[in-house]
Amino acid sequence: MVTYKDAGVDIYKEDKVIRALASQIKFERNDAIKPADLKGHYAGAIEFGDYYLVLCTDGVGSKMVVAEMANKFDTVPIDMIAMNVNDAICIGAEPVALVDYMAVEDITEDIASQIGKGLNDGIKESNINLIGGETASLPNMIKGVDLAGTVLAVVKKDEIVSGKEVKPGDLIVGLRSSGIHSNGLSLARKVFFDIANLDVNSKLSHGKTVAEELLTPTKIYVKPVLEMIKQVNVKGLAHITGGGFRKLKRLNKEVCYKIDELPEILPIFKEIQNLGSVADEEMFKTFNMGIGFCVIVDKEDAEKIIEISNHHNIPAFVIGKIEDSVELNGETKRETVLVEYNNKKMIME
């Protein structure tokens, strides 16, 4: 059975590397501009009067490799923007501006135009301004193109959504993803291109080509989630990216997140699992599995969240609930994420 680690990505090693880096960051300004207490959350924030200024930075990862293989670059900028704005809204902040960074080996005007179109589509869907950026020609350092960006968002101090209010009895509403989004591409490429010997134009069993599936842009959840925050007492928000539902532990770490009512898994994930003989646990630790964003609310507010999401043409479902503890093989587990799928219970550590 192939794993994400076999494809060159070790998420546990990445966690250790991040901790090693963060352990050396000790300086902090000694004035009124102080960081918010959001350690380990989706975004960082600093005080600015009655507001927090929120910053997120991210890129598109190896999805760009598929774009180069297909010679199609107009969707990956949407992914880059989505990865940033979807993180920013996890603390209730409204994204307002973006700066981008593009590193290139060499680039044509056609590719630049495609990237520009994608940037425009992404900022329009997110309702943000692109206010600057940098393009670096680095022929001796990289091959192809890499694209990243940083988003600025704002939130009133008394409106921040930290996840600390999440408690047993709350429901988890899952918002449908558009597909693979921007995580797990290394494993997907290994399965499709190395194991199954397909190419970007190969048709999968459900009719779409490999390129169509892998280059479908990440869903941008800004508009529905900001509307939810205005209308409902939202307790926790989670962008389901690398690591899958493990991301829920970025919220209240003292409870259990039980995912036991998942909707039908999207075809792209079935294709990857079947062609690569990937274990259920590995799939759920690598991919979003059809749920790109989670909203945690009181039981009585779940239907309103689903209604708002559906209004924005994003299917939504109650996929689980918050519990004090969960049972697995006769053992009581606390402070964890439990996923039930295919009559199997899996702890997402």
From Swiss-Prot:
One of its GO terms (molecular function) is ATP binding. It is an enzyme of class 6 (ligase). Pathway: Purine metabolism; IMP biosynthesis via de novo pathway; 5-amino-1-(5-phospho-D-ribosyl)imidazole from N(2)-formyl-N(1)-(5-phospho-D-ribosyl)glycinamide: step 2/2. It catalyses: 2-formamido-N(1)-(5-O-phospho-beta-D-ribosyl)acetamidine + ATP = 5-amino-1-(5-phospho-beta-D-ribosyl)imidazole + ADP + phosphate + H(+). It holds the Pfam family AIRS. Its EC number is 6.3.3.1. GO terms for biological process: 'de novo' IMP biosynthetic process; adenine biosynthetic process. GO terms for cellular component: cytosol. Keywords: ATP-binding, Cytoplasm, Ligase, Nucleotide-binding, Purine biosynthesis. It is found in: Cytoplasm. Its main location: cytoplasm. InterPro entries: PurM-like_C_dom, PurM-like_C_sf, PurM-like_N, PurM-like_N_sf, PurM_cligase. HAMAP family: AIRS. NCBIfam families: purM. Belongs to the AIR synthase family. This is Phosphoribosylformylglycinamidine cyclo-ligase.
